[in-house]
Amino acid sequence: MAFHNNHFNHFTDQQQHQPPPPPQQQQQQHFQESAPPNWLLRSDNNFLNLHTAASAAATSSDSPSSAAANQWLSRSSSFLQRGNTANNNNNETSGDVIEDVPGGEESMIGEKKEAERWQNARHKAEILSHPLYEQLLSAHVACLRIATPVDQLPRIDAQLAQSQNVVAKYSTLEAAQGLLAGDDKELDHFMTHYVLLLCSFKEQLQQHVRVHAMEAVMACWEIEQSLQSFTGVSPGEGTGATMSEDEDEQVESDAHLFDGSLDGLGFGPLVPTESERSLMERVRQELKHELKQGYKEKIVDIREEILRKRRAGKLPGDTTSVLKSWWQSHSKWPYPTEEDKARLVQETGLQLKQINNWFINQRKRNWHSNPSSSTVSKNKRRSNAGENSGRDR
């Protein structure tokens, strides 16, 4: 069984009339998939067909096959094409022979195309029922997330939510055709190697975004800074000054000359483009994610240490109740003697240092709420000061 390059292009409602793709898209799309069976064209799903803005606006075209030009999903690797060269050559040869047959044989061409469509649908049903399909889909979507602008990422999630509809379609086909998930070593080999290929491609894309693309953005920024230092004009800067008409004309001519030199050199605008801003935002998100992953363990350890110290600083509730009881009974003079402290140590099981710290903090908390104790303290200090002054005399 051979797996052709279009086996990952799920049948969706993609037969909208669309204008022909531009030349750049035509160069990138060497493989055109055949039209799906009619029974699969009733779906409103748009499973990972990310190029839908242009197709929805252009419904007056007469070329149904151009729907494949806007499809992102499923451009299989080159090793899949090499494995099917013989089959493709045979199909092309048979097609040429049929074309030479008179017009009465056109029905044979239609039957041949219909058989190819159902064969492709059968292969897709086998792929979707394979145990590695979820891993294959996850690896492919991971590559898409790297190459997709940040503001377009929610569209991938929205289309992933419709994946069950696609699986249900091909499950119906599989049940109707009586397909059984048997021991297909070729399919297992294909699924395993394709998942590994996508994972490797994801790493290459990440390396490109983090290193090469960021270097290109920084190089453009350095060029802008150099131009600004040479000319003294910053991006989007206005003069805001009042000049005479002659000076205005001179400045205007200089500005036109400066703009022309920029166009001639091909530097383009000095302000970042939307793609550059999206790329810088993606790099920032990637670096933020890496920093979180790299310092996650240290952050967790520091948090646990802080919580442990907080828990260690709090005394048990039964011990504080004993200390509070003593405090309330001695509210006029909340200064325990050494004998009182020794008795509290025996009753609470705390250390002498802990008891001293608790009374210090308790007096600070109740310094203004207990005027009687503060008055007694002041009177005692005054009496002690008077006795000391009398002795000095």
Curated annotation (Swiss-Prot):
Gene3D superfamilies: Homeodomain-like. SUPFAM superfamilies: Homeodomain-like. Belongs to the TALE/KNOX homeobox family. The keyword DNA-binding applies. GO terms for cellular component: cytosol; nucleus. Disulfide bonds: none annotated. Residues 1-13, 368-377 have a biased composition (Polar residues). GO terms for molecular function: DNA binding; DNA-binding transcription factor activity. It is found in: Nucleus. This is Homeobox protein knotted-1-like 4. Keywords: DNA-binding, Homeobox, Nucleus.
